[in-house]
């Protein structure tokens, strides 16, 4: 039996009312964001071509090398890992024989030991590993032929075991070359070329067209990683170059045009909070917890809050991205977060203040127990089925089950906790599964959208554009590897639209 015309009318009116008031529904007010990664904070894997023009590009800041005397067949070693003599007497290389490069120019380098001291020729021809900071006597000129090196001292002599001229050649082994961030790019290119490369990158990597695309695909916010040097524009400290502040202003302009909100994310803090390239670490060290660096970071938060607090597109400020659990003490972080909260509140009562969970072996509940602030606070969790040997063993079905069986209970438990809202600030539709089908990717993405959609604040996909296509949000949407995520694609919304169509048919017939 068909639905009476009166029933069609009532159903249609209800749908029209619900559709017109849908913006007040939780599904429409939660954050559905995309990160603008690799734009104002460089990550080489996102756009590798940025590094193409660097001479000796395999010897960037932070590259770890080991040096073996060709004549003696022994490794150069900093006894005790630094702080003492330098010898060439080890048959096998380990941490004492591994040095981190500080690049001065494409031919001049400083060598840092595992304990932090630098090789120095401060005593003339006697080389030791005793300098706490580098200068002229800690700078060595490299004569290179592929992996073979001569290391020239300031006085014109060469580093050579036993000071035998035939022993001056070392074979260099690159142990790790995994830092490709802002420091490596700008210092590797030099100030003039870095200005050219980064100006072009900031202008064209993300444009207003991307903001338009996001707005048309159900995204209502962007999370924008920035580096601490943005507060010093137009004259940031070397090697960083000017322009990131103007670009952030432009992002806020586009956001206002296309109806998006902005989360400013302090991704790179002075001294580095995690030793990774995306924190602009020079050599993998984590020096952020020092009082001087924390004070400098708070100055950056003050600058950002003061500049953008009254901008209608500001949604929130994230005080620090991914502090390391192994290097940043919880007490230090909590103290910083509380002070940062007060700074933001001094300019805005409405802006959300976002606290990122420590990465590594840390319980997200630790921030809920810290009483970081009374109003509009958010804890940011980053969920990847990557970066852990556990996930390497999982097939497609097991990855999807992990989202439902492990992530869902954690999100729900945190949602119920008495404290900040929950934000899945980074996640991606990528995994370690080889040869996965498009359907499997769709199911994996669907699971994440369903589970992370339960988070009380919302979620943010990493990232808008990337050289690795499954990390690229726009590629995923255009090629239908990621389906959903927009309220316009939800079953409830489709039902409302159907009701409206029925109502229109009723009044037109």
Which residues make up each language-model segment?
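Cleavable N-terminal signal peptides of Sec/SRP-targeted secreted and luminal proteins
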Residues: 4-22, 494-508
């Amino acid at each position: 039996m068909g639905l009476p015309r009166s029933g069609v009318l009532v159903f249609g009116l209800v749908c029209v009312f619900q559709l017109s008031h849908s913006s007040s529904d939780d599904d429409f007010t939660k954050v559905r964001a995309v990160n603008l990664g690799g734009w104002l904070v460089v990550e080489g894997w996102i756009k590798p071509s940025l590094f193409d023009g660097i001479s000796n590009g395999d010897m960037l800041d932070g590259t770890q090398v080991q040096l073996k005397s060709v004549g003696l067949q022994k490794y150069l070693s900093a006894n005790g890992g630094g702080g003492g003599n330098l010898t060439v007497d080890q048959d096998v290389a380990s941490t004492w024989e591994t040095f981190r490069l500080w690049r001065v120019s494409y031919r001049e380098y400083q060598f840092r030991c595992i304990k932090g001291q630098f090789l120095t020729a401060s005593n003339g021809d006697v080389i030791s590993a005793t300098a706490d900071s580098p200068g002229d006597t800690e700078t060595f000129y490299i004569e290179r032929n592929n992996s073979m090196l001569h290391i020239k001292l300031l006085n014109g002599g060469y580093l050579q075991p036993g000071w035998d001229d035939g022993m001056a050649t070392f074979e260099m082994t690159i142990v790790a070359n995994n830092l490709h961030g802002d420091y490596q790019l700008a210092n590797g290119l030099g100030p003039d070329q870095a200005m050219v490369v980064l100006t072009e990158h900031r202008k064209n990597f993300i444009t207003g067209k991307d903001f338009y695309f996001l707005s048309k695909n159900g995204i209502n916010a962007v999370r924008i990683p920035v580096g601490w040097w943005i507060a010093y524009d137009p004259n940031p400290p070397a090697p960083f170059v000017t322009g990131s502040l103007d670009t952030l202003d432009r992002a806020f302009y586009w956001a206002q045009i296309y109806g998006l909100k902005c989360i400013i994310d302090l991704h790179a803090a002075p001294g580095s909070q995690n030793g990774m390239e995306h924190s602009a670490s020079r050599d993998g060290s984590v020096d952020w917890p020092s009082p001087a660096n924390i004070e400098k970071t708070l100055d950056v938060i003050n600058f950002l809050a003061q500049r953008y607090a009254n901008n209608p597109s500001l949604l929130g400020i994230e005080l620090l991205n991914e502090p390391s659990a192994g290097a940043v003490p919880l007490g230090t972080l909590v103290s910083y977060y509380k002070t940062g909260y007060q700074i933001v509140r001094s300019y805005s009562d409405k802006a959300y203040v976002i606290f990122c969970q420590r990465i590594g072996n840390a319980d997200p509940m630790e921030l809920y127990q810290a009483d970081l602030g009374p109003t509009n606070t958010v804890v940011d969790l980053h969920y990847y089925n990557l970066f852990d040997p556990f996930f390497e063993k999982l097939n497609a079905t097991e990855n999807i089950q992990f989202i439902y069986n492990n992530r869902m209970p954690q999100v729900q438990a945190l949602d119920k906790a008495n404290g900040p809202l929950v934000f899945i600030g980074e996640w991606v539709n990528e995994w370690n599964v080889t040869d996965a089908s498009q359907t499997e990717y769709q199911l994996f993405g669907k699971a994440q959208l369903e589970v992370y959609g339960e988070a009380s604040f919302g979620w943010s996909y990493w990232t808008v554009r990337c050289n690795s296509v499954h990390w690229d949000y726009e590629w995923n949407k255009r090629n239908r590897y990621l389906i959903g995520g927009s309220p316009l694609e939800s079953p409830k919304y489709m039902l409302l639209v159907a009701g409206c169509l029925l109502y229109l048919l009723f009044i037109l017939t």
